[in-house]
Amino acid sequence: YSAVPIDAWVVIGILVLMMFQTWVVMYRKFRYSGRVEKGNERFRSEFAEVGTDLEQLMDNRQLEDDLRHSSLWQLYRVAVGELRTRRAQGADTNNLSAETLEAIRASMDGVRTQQNRELSSSLGVLSNAIAGGPYIGLLGTVMGIMVVFLGTAMAGDVNINAIAPGMAAALLATAMGLFVAIPALFAYNRLNGRNRDISSDMRVSLDEFVTRLAEIHATSTEPAERPASAARHDHAQTPVT
């Protein structure tokens, strides 16, 4: 290591800091996405059993604590919160208009955006490591080789045995850059795949909840129109005497 020029050591030090930063980010993001996936799986199993009482999960405090990391639970909580807020203000939540359903959907969309932003936070650190790590390492190698050649020229000794150790040591910077970038690349792709799956689950869950809400509580004018239609039909069928 004594053959490594000081310039290369500076670059290697920067790469070591980048490596620790990327590994910390990878650990935190994998841990977070794993908790979200586990919570979402639990929420799906619980929500599948609610039937027509869509609000019953909200009253289970133990379940709320268990699902605090679930992105689907966050969508569910804001939707039920919107319903209960309207009910507390005197609105008839047994008959929801299309506008009310769209307002609830908009609130859930806002939470979904926040969850997606949380999932993608800090991924820029991995992206920077992937794109910048090899180039920073290459910069250290180039600077190290330049120093080796400059020292050789000043000494007047062109013996390959004198040059080779310095060049090999300078290449350590490139190796460090690749060591930073390659794990970050695999982790970035894996985390992106997980985030896409979680985002898809949120979109499906949002649509399912709003659809079931509309099925149970949506305002329908069909029952009011049906008697008039039936009356007209009966009048048409009445024989003239």
Q: Model regions: which residues?
A:
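Bilayer-spanning, highly hydrophobic alpha-helical transmembrane segments
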Residues: 10-16, 20, 121-151, 163, ...
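Predominantly long cytosolic amphipathic alpha-helical stalk/bundle segments
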Residues: 38-135, 147-159, 186-241
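Residue-level signature of catalytic and energy-coupling elements of molecular machines
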Residues: 5, 23, 57-60, 76, ...
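Hydrophobic membrane-targeting segments
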Residues: 1-45, 191
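Membrane-helix interfacial "entry" motifs
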Residues: 1-4, 66, 114, 158-169
